[in-house]
Amino acid sequence: MAEQKYRYTLHAVVREEQGKGASRRLRRQGLVPAIIYGGNTEPQAIAIKQDELKKNAKNHSFFSQIINLKIDGQEDQEILVRDVQHHIYKPLFQHFDFQRIVRGQEITATVLLEFVGEERAPGIKTDGGIVSRHMTTVEVICRPSLLPEYIAVDLSEANIGDIITLADLKLPEGVRLVGDMEDEEFAATVVVQISYPQREEQMEDTDTAAADEEGDKEEDADKQE
């Protein structure tokens, strides 16, 4: 079997102490507390460098791709990000939940939608249509080895009024959406649509209506005074 290649690798240490106090001490040292669970193995408390996480997280696919986890003295593990807690106002991670991957067993994961061909779409390039993205990710089920980095949504032939739904997505072989595609309502969920551009007179009407509304509010305020 060929050696698995990973786009992301993390290095961690085992957390001997747990609890809020221990977590605060780790964060002061530039470490982020985390937990690994699943795979018929006991949960394991670990800590990862904040800088290493921030570097990897610059690419959004980090949150949906299989990660190779290295812990000193242990065999490498394959994991997926399951939950992330952020600092309330600082650009820092507070905690990560990871799920162990078991080769051969299907997993559920969030995959990015990548919209391509927009610059060639006649409804956009020629007619000035507006692209409205209703979804940017989808939940999929597949074997770990088949997990795609993203799912492409081709807009190159899109015209004004066109709608792309979940049923229109071209999924890689062995990958399926979480949900019942036999359910017409689910299958018809809108992913992206190309709308008519707003005309100048419509914009003027909108601006006039907003100005009239603001004037009414000022008049009411004057009466109250």
From Swiss-Prot:
Subunit structure: Part of the 50S ribosomal subunit; part of the 5S rRNA/L5/L18/L25 subcomplex. Contacts the 5S rRNA. Binds to the 5S rRNA independently of L5 and L18.
Protein name as annotated: Large ribosomal subunit protein bL25
Provenance organism: Dichelobacter nodosus (strain VCS1703A)
Family: Belongs to the bacterial ribosomal protein bL25 family. CTC subfamily.
Positions of region (Disordered): 197-225
GO cellular component: cytosolic large ribosomal subunit
GO molecular function: 5S rRNA binding; structural constituent of ribosome
Comp. bias intervals (Acidic residues): 202-225
Keywords assigned: Ribonucleoprotein, Ribosomal protein, RNA-binding, rRNA-binding
SUPFAM superfamilies: Ribosomal protein L25-like
CDD domains named in the record: Ribosomal_L25_TL5_CTC
NCBIfam families for this protein: bL25_bact_ctc (TIGR00731), PRK05618.1-2 (NF004128), PRK05618.1-5 (NF004130), PRK05943.1 (NF004612)
Gene: rplY
Physiological role: This is one of the proteins that binds to the 5S RNA in the ribosome where it forms part of the central protuberance.
